[in-house]
Amino acid sequence: IIISNLISFPKINEIYELMGLLSQNNYSNYPPIHQTITFLTLLITDKSIITSIISLRLILILFDLGILYYGIKLLKILKKPKNIIFIYFLNPLVILELIGNLHLEGVMVFFMVLSFYHLYRKKEIYSGIFLGLSILTKLIPLIILPLFLCRLGLKKSIRFILTITVLISTGFVPFIKFKSLINYSESINLWFS
């Protein structure tokens, strides 16, 4: 476990033992922004798991506030009632999984909302940047990439894809070590086995 060499939690070995074989025997398949947020949360706390959990929960709440702010702005552009945004926030899955269980899909959704916001403002470069950041948080937004391309047309799609490609390539620079890329790829391949 790489983090155990950098950060010393008193019960890190006990936690590692409780992870289960799938997590113990494979490297993380989370993209760089996800890794960075969780790593920084561990780094800034006082080596207390409780403090780390509270810190991560506060970070996720800040991203949720960003979803609220830009979600309302996006709904205004779309000429939809702004109270629709509360369908997202009152969804039990969002409440339990994102804030309760500390999943970083809320960070991904924040960047996706910003991407859509800029898409509807006809700023495809900014839209590409934020979709790239969303992909660097979780890989799920790759699924909706074709929807953007249909809306943008060929010329703007090329700029959009180039923006995302440069951003994602830059985001993976810390993984340039060939062995790290192999470990990441092997973990991603678990999804398809």
Give residue ranges: language-model regions.
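Primarily membrane-embedded glycan-assembly and transfer machineries that use lipid-linked glycans
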Residues: I1-N101, V107-V113, L152-S193
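Residue-level recognition of short, well-ordered coil/turn positions
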Residues: K123-E124, L154
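Membrane-interface alpha helices of multi-pass inner-membrane proteins
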Residues: I95-L98, L114-H118, E124-L149
